[in-house]
């Protein structure tokens, strides 16, 4: 009887370890895919921004050029999610696109604007706790600099005012914060959220 109970416990333990291994492997694969997607979107964002700047400096476009079809890069960017800017955080060696619309699918690719806008000084950006996204937000300290560059090439520089842990259901803590920029992500296990509140530099 004891041997049978031991065998059952052994099998259960092995099943739990296997499930943890599979979950860890899936998370690592999701993280890698998100990192690759973010890199592609960021590269496209900078290419689009440069193209827009070139077009603006060239003045009015030639009518014959307007009749030509869009180059392949422009056509590809139409299929990608809309990107409102590039977020650079030197203190944690991070450069990421910020997608315009929050959704579960978009969050798998890159951090997303969840509420507000840079122009209204109430931007809230949510990102996954992937190594390729916001897993290191909790390492930021007061005074660390962040830069958000929009599609027109305008940069806004912020500094971290404070970092806090908030309850996972406390939406008001990030949405109603009196800061022009808030970044947040889940803690491991999604039991809480790490929120970084930023002022203009």
Segments predicted by a language model, with ranges:
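Solvent-exposed, non-transmembrane regions of membrane-associated and secreted proteins
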Residues: 3-201
